[in-house]
Amino acid sequence: KKWYRDAEKVLKRALKREKKHEQATYYTGEMYLYKHQFSEAESRFRSVVEGKGEYSGRADRMWQLSQKIVRAMPGTDIGKKVALYEEITRADLAVLLAEELRVSVLMEKSQSPGSGFQTPSQVNNNSAVPSDSEGHWAEVWINEISRYGILEAAPGQPFYPDETINRAEYAMAIQRVLSITTGDAG
């Protein structure tokens, strides 16, 4: 985090010398983006785009990214960090679902204490943890999401936490969260 302070000092000096310095404004926007100050970043990128200079194409792409992040409004530090990734892994998605959506709270609210008979396989599925989650940085979240069957991994089978999530897996995970929380099996 020290580089933020150093970069900020240099960029402020450059902008003090020349208020509309395109490169300094662009890199200030990047610095704010990586500091998770997305609205500030958006403002800097917009300024560069409006200047229509050499950096306007780059700034436009970064401006679009910062706008998407601002609209998504990640509420946790993890959500803000993951928002900057081009692609996310299965572990990243497990963390997002657990932290941003607070899946355990949703699941507890949607499942009443006497919610009916469970077969032995359902009981085992609720308590099984993936064989490759142990020792992983996202172990707690992976186990939480696996316990509810949101991201598929057969009991005792690998979760593949570092594999990039594809659209189908993402859609199925969201569909499971929605169907479990709304009670709609369809």
Segments from the language model and where they lie:
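N-terminal propeptides
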Residues: 2-9, 16-186
